[in-house]
Amino acid sequence: YKRMKEGDKNALVDTTANFQKLIDINARHDEVRDVINGRVQDKKVIIELQDVFYVQYLSLDSLRSGKVQYYNRHIMDYNQAHNYNPAITLCNKDLVYPADFAESYVEELTGRIMQTGDADAYLIRGSIYLNQKEYAKAIEDLSAILEKEPDNLLALFNLANARMLMFDYIESVDDKIPRIVGEQQQMQRKIDYSQVIEGYNECLRIDSDFVFALFNMANVYAKNGEIEKAIETFNQVLRLDKDIAEAYFNRGLLYIYTGQKALANADLSKAGELGIVSAYNVIKRYCKEN
């Protein structure tokens, strides 16, 4: 086990195999790792779950050009209250900022924080740190907001995301550390996602319709091997918003895992219709009846 101290709890780093049919559950071969962190993999092809959503800084130019993945009431309220300066968005792909932008903007935000302890500056700086994969700094900034505003939904959401992504990053680094020749294979390790789930539940306490907290929670369940919980949570996502392409895609992968090819085909087809073109390749490869 590799231990990592985060707050007053320890997180245990995990590499859990998830997907039957395509792989041998819990198999951990040195030549080909079958599944790591929610990825469906055979000997040649890796299919990853669509990633979690998190709050990211969005430039006004990007906003004007329509580079917004999904609209959300909390995001719109924040942007309108701040006259879109700054503006934020919910996205499950890392936005790419111009060269040197992040560093210079972080310096500006740091100055504001030192002068006033501005919660908005903490939120934007923490979100940029999260985008730049500086997870510990992101956690520190978002926690600072919650000390004063415990019901700040956007800070709660990104704090849960930062913890989850940090746990997964540490797992990926640990998994790549070469073993000494002759060393026995390491025991299966499991991440403690309890703080992450708790954070998403806090978001849902504030707004039970906050679909992105449900989506991210479903992804955590899938990574943790709780497949039925993950499917049911994706069901909740799609009951709230039937146009979340990523939920259809991820639920479709889980249906493949459970051997329900017809349901997988339907979900992946819908994901393709909604813009995830790679879903069609998954259908061709895994949804054909034998």
Q: What feature does the model see in each segment?
A:
Residues 5-52, 56-62, 66-93, 164-199:
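Short coil/linker segments at helix-helix boundaries
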Residues 111-114, 144-147, 201-205, 236-239, ...:
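Conserved structural position within tetratricopeptide repeats
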Residues 118, 152, 210, 244, ...:
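Residue-level recognition of tetratricopeptide repeat
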Residues 124, 158, 216, 250, ...:
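Canonical tetratricopeptide repeat
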